[in-house]
From Swiss-Prot:
It catalyses: (S)-dihydroorotate + H2O = N-carbamoyl-L-aspartate + H(+). CDD domains: DHOase. PROSITE patterns: DIHYDROOROTASE_1 (PS00482), DIHYDROOROTASE_2 (PS00483). InterPro entries: Amidohydro-rel, DHOdimr, Dihydroorotase_CS, Metal_Hydrolase. HAMAP family: PyrC_classII. NCBIfam families: pyrC_dimer. GO terms for cellular component: cytosol. This is Dihydroorotase. It comes from Erythrobacter litoralis (strain HTCC2594). The modification N6-carboxylysine is found at residue 100. Pfam families: Amidohydro_1.
Length: 344
């Protein structure tokens, strides 16, 4: 039985740091594990310009513990009024690594998101020419579409037509949750990749609803049927290099999750690697973990892999029920459960 696992230091290709006290409280959890992270721009107000992106990056860097090497990779929040010149300028000058497309009102702080994706095709053409990645929250928001069908409908209505129209555009299909998304990514050209979260590998929709409402298992996109979870597991542990790690770690204070209208988001950062590794061990795929966590993402983004390594050891430990941060009390994914691996 393997007792330790050493891999190149991984990256998180999708997460939320928030801002202010919460940001300062959660950045260290990510920085201790990952060398880089794609940081979501859905603040209030959102990160829509190069100047805002540069300022947010400095705030994040100020929250990184002394002596820790961590690089935030910033994203621009796309709106119906996005200035393509500023966007591309931010990319070419190293402020932005990618741009983020939120359909309006699809998730937390997305009210300023895009209402007409096709109207932004000229912006996407500019991005494709520059080699800039488009990160997409792939859900429709129409009131007549069942919440469990939002991703499937988005593929048919928006993602497939966009890819057909601009096949040179690199698209990161973020936090995929369905076998439909897996099939789309596998069938598309190499400019389509996808991140998979730990929660969507561990839980199906029963985890939100059985035994009472479970608010700390509620995120967007919501977890789906068991058949979809199994398809995601297969993609992560034995699929092509198009799939890579992205936690979608999204901290909210405990009391805002446990309320009459609880916030969407799972705080996966504190035990992210241990959570993913549990899945790879269950699928007898420990030898595939480094590719998913450390190699596939850099290859998709055209960035070098990290030179450093990290080691996880088989040391069972209990995840605390909550964590006290500068931003308040937050409940981590796997709270109250035992994990078999621990980062040294």
């Amino acid at each position: 039985m393997t007792e330790t696992l050493t891999i190149r230091r991984p990256d998180d290709w999708h997460l939320h740091f928030r801002d202010g006290a919460m940001m300062r409280g959660v950045v260290p959890y990510t920085a201790r594990q990952f060398a880089r992270a794609i940081v979501m721009p859905n603040l209030t107000p959102p990160v829509t310009t190069t100047a805002l992106g540069a300022a947010y990056r400095e705030r994040i860097l100020a929250a990184v513990p002394e002596g820790v090497d961590f690089r935030p990779l910033m994203t621009a929040y796309l709106t119906d009024e996005t200035d393509a010149d500023d966007l591309i300028d931010g990319y070419t000058h190293g402020v932005f690594t990618a741009a983020k497309l939120y359909p309006a009102n699809a998730t937390t702080n997305s009210a300023s998101g895009v209402t007409d994706v096709e109207a932004l095709y000229p912006v996407f053409e500019r991005m494709a020419a520059a080699g800039m990645v488009l990160c997409i929250h792939g859900e429709v928001t129409d009131a007549d579409v069942d919440v469990f069908d939002r991703e499937k409908e988005f593929i048919e209505r928006t993602m497939a037509p966009l890819h057909a129209a601009i096949p040179a555009l690199k698209i990161a299909f973020e936090h995929i949750t369905t076998s439909d998304a897996v099939d789309f990514v596998v069938g598309a050209n190499d400019n389509i990749g996808a991140t998979i979260t730990p929660q969507h590998l561990h839980i199906n929709r029963n985890a939100m609803l059985v035994g009472g409402i479970q608010p700390h298992n509620y995120c967007l996109p919501v977890a789906k049927r068991e058949t979809h979870r199994l398809a995601l597991r297969q993609a992560a542990t034995s699929g092509p290099p198009k799939f890579f790690l992205g936690t979608d770690s999204a901290p909210h204070e405990k009391h805002t999750k446990e309320s009459a209208c609880g916030c969407a988001g799972i705080f996966g950062a504190p035990y992210a690697l241990e959570s993913y590794l549990a899945v790879f061990e269950e699928e007898d795929a420990l030898d595939k973990f480094e590719a998913f966590a450390s190699l596939n993402g850099p290859a998709f983004y055209g960035l070098p892999v990290n030179d450093e390594t990290i080691t996880l050891e088989r040391v069972p430990h209990n995840v605390p029920d909550s964590l006290e941060t500068e931003g308040g009390k937050v409940v981590p994914f796997h709270a109250g459960q035992e994990l078999n691996w621990r980062l040294k």
